[in-house]
Amino acid sequence: MAPAVAVVAAAAAFPFRLFSAEARRNTKGSRSKRGSARPLKPSPPPRPSASSSAAGGGGATTFTRLPLRNAPASVEVTLDRFPTANPEPRASTFTRRNGERLGDDEEDEEEEEDEVELGLRGATTFARLPLRDSPDGGDLTIGHFDAGVAPQEGLRSRAISRQLVEHLDDVEEEEEEQVVSRLDIFEGAKGREARAFLPDEDDEDDDVVVFDPEYDGYSDDEEFVATAVEQSPRGDAIAVAELEKLKYDNDDDDDDDDEVVVFHPDDDEEVDVFEDYDDDEEEETKEKGVPAVMRCFDTAKIYAKAGDGGNGVVAFRREKYVPLGGPSGGDGGRGGNVFVEVDGDMNSLLPFRKSVHFRAGRGAHGQGRQQAGAKGDDVVVKVPPGTVVRSAAGDVELLELMRPGQRALLLPGGRGGRGNAAFKSGTNKAPRIAEKGEKGPEMWIDLELKLVADVGIVGAPNAGKSTLLTAISAAKPTIANYPFTTLLPNLGVVSLDFDATMVVADLPGLLEGAHRGYGLGHEFLRHSERCSVLVHVVDGSGEQPEYEFEAVRLELELFSPSLVDKPYIVVYNKMDLPEASERWNKFQEKLQAEGIEPYCISAMNRQGTEDVVLAAYKVLQKDRQRMKDDEEWNGPENLNHVADAIKRERRAPMNEFEIFHDKGTNTWNVVGAGIERFVQMTNWQYSESLKRFQHALEACGVNKTLIKRGVKEGDTVVVGEMEMVWTDEPSKTRSSKTMNSKDDSVRWPEFG
């Protein structure tokens, strides 16, 4: 008992012609395969064939070709409904009532069709089909809208008789249990796309499906299939509309009329095709994230890869009067290294917002006459002072670069493969074997900046921190009379004498709960850990400056207990305001009772700021002397320890391995840095490489260990990138020549 669904396909530039009744009868027998409909139903009823439909079978299908504007191809829209009990085909775009035609005279009907055709030139029509097994057929109407008008403005009629809904309310229970697929709306590149989902039992809302075929990336010869199912308020299917094939020319981006719209069956309000889909449920409000500029100021994630080594070559000396020249294949060049260098001119990680991938060059391949390949180009990642380098995989701190000019080797390049000249021996004077270059290490790296400032200015929002920085340095931060004016840390250099300077950082304001993520201060609290001295600015115009001072101190302690142990200076600001002057004595007495001597200033009038600068510099000199003594005691720091660890792993012996057995698949995995590196550098295009690999497995004890663990014939053995099938026949696993070869063929040269 599925009522008809309204389908609108707009064609702006070409007239639309209705098929006559006789033409429709003729087209039923030659129904196009592209126009076949597929109801989105788990167990659809049997569909009538085209021949049975033409002979007066139970089902009826109409299809209409709508030419798109500026497109040589066309759109085929198919309406499919379930078979009816009436054997007469009911495919018609004209109004029917109780299953009968309005006019008994066929000539009158043809005249009416001609009138409709003339009246709808340049417009689009949509058809409504009668209900399945409906005793009265329902009231079905025809509506249209002008193609030159926007769809939501030109719609003339979409009314379906309320009898359809009333009839569906009386449907039997067994038919209510009929499960069909439902559709939802998903945003696309241009427009929206309809996709099918299984319905929920409690979901009784009607679905409105709006499909816009204008998508980026589709060429003229590509196709898109869209299917829509309308549901009644009780959940059973009304009708199915399918856009089987769509071909269009997307050169004209202004063609907004080529659309297929499926409307509510019982909603008289216009459906806005171009507006967002509105389902009466309230959308969840997402918190606004940190802006990209702030997020990338002191954190970044980059990808670094060292260069692969060049391949060795197989070559022989061919020279006049030298009949037995011997092997002359050269070794491949070493891959480029990845360095991390501190650039004193940088003060943020914003350059890494667009530059993410850093790849060193690959070593050149070897050549004849024992010519080794050239080394790959190195790549240098420049970072500001105070950058911490961590591994993104394990969150392990790798490096901490503090001073400008520091340079650390992060990833060493891969070793070049050996040519056949390196495999020459007394028993093998003309080797036909060479190695591939070693792959360079790669990793994702997290960069975190902790500004290297001598003095850090902290405090509540709108306390006058930026104003103080402007008064004591040449920095020009944004200053305004509202909280959170400072969104990013600002740096300024304070000069006392010709050779006495200090760097001062103005940090964003702190709120109560900043250590848990409230406000903006928690994003930049890490920068205060680098500061030798903290200047705590208190807003004297506040109602409770004592409470503000204690709250900020508590937030610093909760974020990092080491911040409380740092020397700090308390500055009472805005003494130019009367209310601040009135509260100064009370604030001073409270802090003096705790052993703290505060300073009162007016940063706006630059009164009292010199005393603050001298006090901070005095504390800074003591801290610099302490750090210098510690550095002389501990000695210079090794910045290449990450590369040294990679080199040690490369020198791992081949006899250090582990074997893991997967009983479900009878797979034996041999894991070891040395044996896996051997497999990766083996060039399998040479027959001698396989013999060398078989001997290596025997020499390092892999075969012996597998036999002890109970490997059986037919099991799979995986060593690095090589996968083999184990066999007990010695003739298939190794040859006599391999057994007689020397162990020198599997040894590695020292890493250089």
Swiss-Prot record:
Keyword Ribonucleoprotein set for record: no
Keywords for this protein: Chloroplast, GTP-binding, Magnesium, Metal-binding, Nucleotide-binding, Plastid, Transit peptide
Keyword check for Plastid: yes
Alphabetical list of Pfam families matching this protein: DUF1967, GTP1_OBG, MMR_HSR1
Binding site for Mg(2+): 466, 486
UniProt feature, compositional bias: Basic and acidic residues: 740-752
One of the protein's GO biological processes: embryo development ending in seed dormancy
InterPro entries: G_OBG, GTP-bd, GTP-bd_Obg/CgtA, GTP-bd_prot_GTP1/OBG_C_sf, GTP1-OBG_CS, GTP1_OBG_dom, GTP1_OBG_dom_sf, OBG_GTPase
Known function: Probable GTP-binding protein that plays a crucial role in chloroplast development and is required for leaf greening during plant growth.
Protein name in UniProt: Probable GTP-binding protein OBGC1, chloroplastic
Annotated source species: Oryza sativa subsp. japonica (Rice)
